[in-house]
């Protein structure tokens, strides 16, 4: 069973010429993935990456073979904001699932935004100071361990210097900022927005509007929790940022989508989570099994789909999942003995 064909069948918007649901990520959608401490949802991030890279490979193969009957969806790339895991982890899991992030980067299919700090920068600065004290002009190459895992160029969202941006000249900015933390958050969100937009435009230009871009935020809680003491209300800044992203996705509904991972049990106040659900076109809630532990099934995916025309929400039939070392399997309810 395929996750996306299950969702596309219910929406009815993404069908091939034979009337079958396309096995690809829905276009023009803001998708919220909600998990908990007991049912962690990072496996879906890796599944999304696997799906879009395999769709790209399948599309390229079909083009080379002049095969017009491809039902695997349109290929594309991903722009991943890593706030939850290191690039090393994404890379290793990708190898197990059958794709190589370095290869995808070289093809122009993958961009990584490092939302975490740069822990190895102090080593380089200390080494430069030592070389200067010794009167050595040329810097010897650091070993790979000291440099950190960096198989290809990445974008650093945060470094050890103060973040500066020209956000005052953008319609996305607010000139009446009084709080330093609020200014910093706005600058970070502004930079994320720009990186997403630039990555999408670059991919569209290089592929003649035939390539999709998947924006991924893994996960949103770090931005929320880091600025939770902000008296001006950082949650509204994040929601405004998502609304800007959502509007851009709607304007380019055939070539981009966004996935957001959010840990719904990290905050006692559920208002922010409810607002996230209201903004999203589709919410995927990951939960454990009501019947308890099962060796064949890890948990359940519940879906809430938004109907923009009627401004209503509909529950889609849930499915079960099993996360293995080198694959992720999905099952219809009742198709496997628990």
From Swiss-Prot:
InterPro entries noted in UniProt = ELP6, P-loop_NTPase
The protein's superkingdom reads: Eukaryota
> What CDD domains would the database entry show?
Elp6
Q: Which Pfam families match?
A: ELP6
Keywords, alphabetical:
tRNA processing
Q: Which GO terms describe its biological process?
A: positive regulation of cell migration; tRNA wobble uridine modification
Q: Which GO terms describe its cellular component?
A: elongator holoenzyme complex
Give the metabolic or biological pathway: tRNA modification; 5-methoxycarbonylmethyl-2-thiouridine-tRNA biosynthesis
Function of the protein? Component of the elongator complex which is required for multiple tRNA modifications, including mcm5U (5-methoxycarbonylmethyl uridine), mcm5s2U (5-methoxycarbonylmethyl-2-thiouridine), and ncm5U (5-carbamoylmethyl uridine). The elongator complex catalyzes formation of carboxymethyluridine in the wobble base at position 34 in tRNAs.
Q: How does it assemble?
A: Component of the elongator complex.
Family in the record:
Belongs to the ELP6 family.
* Protein name, entry field: Elongator complex protein 6
Quote the gene name from the UniProt entry.
Answer: elp6
């Amino acid at each position: 069973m395929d996750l996306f064909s299950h969702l596309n069948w219910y929406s009815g918007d993404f069908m091939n010429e034979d009337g079958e649901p396309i096995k690809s990520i829905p276009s023009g959608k803001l998708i919220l993935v909600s998990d908990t401490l007991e049912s962690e949802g990072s496996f879906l991030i890796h599944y999304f990456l696997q799906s879009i890279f395999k769709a790209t490979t399948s599309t390229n193969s079909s083009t080379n073979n002049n095969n017009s009957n491809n039902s695997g969806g349109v290929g594309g790339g991903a722009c991943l904001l890593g706030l939850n895991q290191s690039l090393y982890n994404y890379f290793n899991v990708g190898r197990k699932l059958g794709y190589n992030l370095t290869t995808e980067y070289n093809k122009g299919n993958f961009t990584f935004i490092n939302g975490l700090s740069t822990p190895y920068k102090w080593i380089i600065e200390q080494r430069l100071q030592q070389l200067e004290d010794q009167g050595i002009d040329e810097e010897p190459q650091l070993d790979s361990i000291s440099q950190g895992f960096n198989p290809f160029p990445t974008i650093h969202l945060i470094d050890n210097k103060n973040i500066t941006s020209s956000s005052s000249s953008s319609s996305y900015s607010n000139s009446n900022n009084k709080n330093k933390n609020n200014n910093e958050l706005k600058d970070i969100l502004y930079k994320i927005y720009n990186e997403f937009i630039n990555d999408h435009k670059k991919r569209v230009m290089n592929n003649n509007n035939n390539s999709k871009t998947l924006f991924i935020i893994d996960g949103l809680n770090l931005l929320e929790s880091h600025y939770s003491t902000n008296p001006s209300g950082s949650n509204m800044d994040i929601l405004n940022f998502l609304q800007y992203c959502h509007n851009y996705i709607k304007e380019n509904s055939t070539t981009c989508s966004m996935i957001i991972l959010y840990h719904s049990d990290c905050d006692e106040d559920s208002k922010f989570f409810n607002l996230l659900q209201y903004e999203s076109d589709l919410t995927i809630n990951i939960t454990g099994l009501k019947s308890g532990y099962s060796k064949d099934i890890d948990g359940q995916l519940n879906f809430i789909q938004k109907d923009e025309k009627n401004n209503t929400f509909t529950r889609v039939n849930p499915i079960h999942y099993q996360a293995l070392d080198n694959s992720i399997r999905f099952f219809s309810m009742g198709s496997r003995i628990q």
